[in-house]
Amino acid sequence: YNDPIFNEFGAEKFKINKLHESKFIEEYKWKKDSQVLGKFEINKWTSDFGDRTDWEEVGEIGISYSLKYARMYGGDLQGIKEKIPYLKELGITAVWLNPVFLSYQNHKYGANDFRHVSPDFGTIRTSGEKHGVEISSQNEHGNKSYVEVLGIDAVDNSEYKLLEINLKGENKGKNGYGETHDPSTWVWTESDLIMVDVIKELHKNGIRVIFDGVFNHSSDRHWTFNMVLAEGSESKYKEWYKFSDFTHHVKIEDYHSDQEAYEILIENKKNVKYNGWAGFDTLPEFNTFNQEYKDYIFNITRKWMIGPDAIESEDWMNDDGIDGWRLDVPNCLENQGFWNEWREVVKSCKKDSYITAELWGNAAGDINKGNKFDTVMNYEWLKTTIGYFINQSSEGGRRYKLKASDFFNELREKRTWYPYQSLQSSQNLNGSHDTDRLYSRIINDRAGRDLEEGKQLEQGYNSIRPDLASVYHPNTTIDWKNIQIKPKDILKLISIFQMTYIGAPMLYYGDEVGMWGATDPYCRKPMLWEEFTYDEERNPSHVNQGEVYDQKADKDLFQWYQKLIKIRKENSVLVYGRFKEILNDDE
């Protein structure tokens, strides 16, 4: 992992294949509002991101909430497979997939079930196919496919319904596949098999795959959390979470109807007390000291790394398991010793596996002992790079000049933080799903993450297509119209540095074709594809909203990134060589 070119994306916004769109609408359970249930629809891929659909209007959902958590565009794993030639043409050699596990959220950073891929990414209704995937009868983390388990019911069955947990009765605590937390009961669903097929195809094309690991918390619909809501303090899963009060809990009994059980579940969620990540009751925190919880996550890790064939291939390009993990908010786990144990599991699955952590700031304490993470998402590299090339204040307000000497000094200091091997494999990112788009940051005086999350546009952030800043520039101290250098030129300068510095360059999906936007959710628009014709976008900024312009992929920028990646690959000194600064002056 010293020489990858990373690409980050999630299936939901990358490419829609449309094989199951109508079935998705029919099956998807959005329980926000009874009115919305009858109106739910997939948002048009090529629409203006700011437009509301009928179901959003009827449900009276605030637009920013809907954009972040509720609306769906229908991107799927088949779409990723279809675009593997595109990734290969660009020069990508590793992909970080945003969460793929079962979740009703569009971003899936709160999982309902880590055992399985979300049906909206795979298939909504089963087909009876195995997608060319072989499953070992000796696999300790699932030795059967859904076809063997369901028999004649393996065709045209609802995968969503099969994954629902039984809250009462003789099958209490099991889903439609008969699974429990015991890995010997686990089954490979059709969506799981589709995911494995995509992994294998990416590997065949020289592209490694890392999953997003979100192990600090689950969604409030995770099956173990729901079992606690159903059973109360008697539940064997109670200690998996941080519950503190069951005083007003009502136990779900076998004599309750399904509707009564559901209503009790909802009331229990309101009445019991538990810790939620960052105060969100929709994201209950795990008790990471609990051994059964740890074993569950360790077995999840083994399932997806070893793959259905249960062996580590000598050649990773022939392997059917993932190659590593990107860890979400790993510093939030109360039990930091969890990561030491988890690392041993990962490295026992694959010797050349890769573990990168979402850590902001100096993370030497988590990297340098070699017993937690291999490396980091290098936000500190991005911060210094932006400070020099964009000359942007970290506190907001007017731009200031970060001198060349200061730029070099910051880089030099940050290179001392980690061992050289960790530096070489650190993800030098130009942005992510948590930041505003780099292209948009260039034309703004304040970075999106410097403002209250979700409030950038209200506070004057300009989210117009950046190449139009020379015509329209209300929120910048630079007069783009009357200077020779343009936002795209600065973007290209940054890309040159990114592709020639120590570390693993990482592109956020669509940056290579000039995608723009403020931070979440506006940095998470559907991918711009050259073959699609998009509706015009109305500037979503809260100033001069009347500006309307085309949405289109920038082919010139794609070719630019393609050329730079090729240069990096053909010159190993850019990957393995030492970095030395040559300072001219600070003018």
Language model features by range: what are they?
Residues 3-68, 223-295, 449-479:
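Glycan-binding loop/region signatures in secreted carbohydrate-active enzymes
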Residues 87, 97, 114, 202, ...:
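Conserved, mostly hydrophobic/aromatic
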Residues 4, 8-32, 37-53, 361, ...:
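Loop/helix patches that line or flank the sugar-binding groove of alpha-linked glycan CAZymes
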Residues 1-200, 204-208, 223, 295, ...:
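N-terminal structural segment of carbohydrate-active enzymes
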Residues 198-199, 203-207, 216-217, 225-232, ...:
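Active-site-proximal helices and loops of the catalytic beta/alpha 8
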Residues 6-22, 27, 105-129, 141, ...:
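Aromatic- and acidic-residue-enriched segments that line the glycan-binding/catalytic groove
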Residues 100, 165-167, 180, 228-346, ...:
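Polysaccharide-binding and catalytic clefts of secreted carbohydrate-active enzymes
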Residues 1-2, 96-107, 213-222, 328-333, ...:
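Short, solvent-exposed turn/loop segments enriched in Gly/Ser/Thr/Pro and often Arg
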